[in-house]
């Protein structure tokens, strides 16, 4: 996923950020690009990065874990309605089930586990969003205009 360079983001418009502006962590260049978009976009009223958690059951160990969605954003729509979104930034490849292979390599098994864990997180997030009248979006390199 993008370059896996962890960095801190300092917003140009800190009043839009909901949380501690000194602790905005970007775990990839793609997340950094999304932070910049949130910060600079006039339609974004407020945004937060990893500021809350959603419990989910991991298929990896069948235990309850905490999932911290990448972003929570409030957007002023064209009709002047305010809409809230939970946003996860992920490579498109991780949003699709791994293609079956004849050899079950370590890499393939890791892809399978990653996909299963993501699906569990996103199922819990969709349920959370339905309960709170929020929309869930997974943003990939396609939406970010990368590649």
Predicted regions and their residues:
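Electrostatic, structured charged patches in enzyme active sites and in nucleic-acid/phosphate-binding
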Residues: 1-147
């Amino acid at each position: 996923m993008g370059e896996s360079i962890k960095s801190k983001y300092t917003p140009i418009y800190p009043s839009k950020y909901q949380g501690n502006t000194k602790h905005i962590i970007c775990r990839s260049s793609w997340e950094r690009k999304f932070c910049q978009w949130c910060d600079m976009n006039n339609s974004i009223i407020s945004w937060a990065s990893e500021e809350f958690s959603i419990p989910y059951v991991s298929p990896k160990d069948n235990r309850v874990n905490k999932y911290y969605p990448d972003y929570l954003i409030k957007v002023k729509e064209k009709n002047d309605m305010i809409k809230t979104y939970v946003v996860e930034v992920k490579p498109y490849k991780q949003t699709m089930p791994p293609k079956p292979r004849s050899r079950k390599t370590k890499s393939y098994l890791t892809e399978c586990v990653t996909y299963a864990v993501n699906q569990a997180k996103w199922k819990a997030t969709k349920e959370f969003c339905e309960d709170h009248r929020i929309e869930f979006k997974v943003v990939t390199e396609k939406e970010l205009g990368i590649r």
